[in-house]
């Protein structure tokens, strides 16, 4: 699928602002070289170490649900190859910042190379257990989780700013994409059914269920 066709198809799902952000990110720089001819197919692609780059429509829908704005500080859990972080970086702009936590060292290095090559300077890749969040920069306006947890990790709730929003898949074989809003209490709404790789960590799964 050509990039133009993919971008046009996304208009069926999300706001024009998200579509424009997606159009500015060169997805071919974030997939393994041998898969570049498939970079603009609307499906997940393997990036190694049992992980995938999410399908473009899913990245777009998660960004739309997050309602990302200029200047926001964002925590991403499950940074993978850096593609989703790049789209969010477009949406928060140069005055915002994305802190992306990834547990696999090789993917952290891959993402850093990809982001540098694509010239994204408002993304920081951090090696660590994403279920613990990243307290050094908390609280966050938005939290995006790109792997499915057994439940919403408590540290992520704590690191979400009052008035903030989190999008997270929850479940094992059957998963729900949840939108979590924090005000005087925590409100959780189901957005849709999804399929993500498991979130591994202290407040996640102990091992893959695939």
Curated annotation (Swiss-Prot):
InterPro entries, per the entry: PCMT, SAM-dependent_MTases_sf
Keyword DNA repair: no
EC number: 2.1.1.77
Similarity-based family: Belongs to the methyltransferase superfamily. L-isoaspartyl/D-aspartyl protein methyltransferase family.
Known function: Catalyzes the methyl esterification of L-isoaspartyl residues in peptides and proteins that result from spontaneous decomposition of normal L-aspartyl and L-asparaginyl residues. It plays a role in the repair and/or degradation of damaged proteins.
UniProt keyword Methyltransferase present: yes
Any GO BP annotation: protein repair
PANTHER family in alphabetical order: PROTEIN-L-ISOASPARTATE O-METHYLTRANSFERASE (PTHR11579), PROTEIN-L-ISOASPARTATE(D-ASPARTATE) O-METHYLTRANSFERASE (PTHR11579:SF0)
GO terms, molecular function: protein-L-isoaspartate (D-aspartate) O-methyltransferase activity
Organism of origin: Methanothrix thermoacetophila (strain DSM 6194 / JCM 14653 / NBRC 101360 / PT) (Methanosaeta thermophila)
PROSITE patterns the record matches: PCMT
Cellular component, GO, one term: cytoplasm
Enzyme active site: 54
Catalytic function, reaction form: [protein]-L-isoaspartate + S-adenosyl-L-methionine = [protein]-L-isoaspartate alpha-methyl ester + S-adenosyl-L-homocysteine
Name of the molecule in the record: Protein-L-isoaspartate O-methyltransferase
Predominant localisation class: cytoplasm
Subcellular location: Cytoplasm
Keywords assigned by UniProt, alphabetized: Cytoplasm, Methyltransferase, S-adenosyl-L-methionine, Transferase
Phylogenetic classification of the source organism: Archaea, Methanobacteriati, Methanobacteriota, Stenosarchaea group, Methanomicrobia
